[in-house]
Amino acid sequence: MKQGLFLICPTGSKADVLNKIAQIDSADAFLYEGSNALPEIKNAVQAKSIAFIVENDAALALKLGADGVQVPYAKGLKNIKAALGDLALGVVCSTRDEAMRAGEAGADYIAFNGEKAAELAVWWIELFTVPCLSLATPCEQADFKVARL
């Protein structure tokens, strides 16, 4: 299995973020942790055929025309998924139970976080088909390799 590449970009000035995007050769997804210059950043990412993921705000993802949203695990994921329509829903989970519940709610990918993130990702890929990634520690078995810009 070839790992996809999931890029995470911290908040920064518009020029800095756009410069980082310009240097990307290829990636599957781009999560921007900021809230400034979102339309311009989204357009630059999508122009490279990379999925633009909004952090923690489903309504904003819809408004911007993003490709998805990544949210922390919480009750009400089915409602978020229904509101998103075709947009991807990524859910940050730190336990097996959270991940299974997120999968049942329709998550398109699971992002494991916490000190056991890699261990949880290995467990997940052995049992489930929903893609996963490990935010906290690298995991070669996960569907996506995470790189911070």
Predicted feature residues:
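Conserved N-terminal beta1-alpha1 strand-loop-helix module at the mouth
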Residues: 1-75, 82-108, 130, 139-141
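Active-site/ligand-binding-proximal alpha/beta "capping" segment
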Residues: 108-149
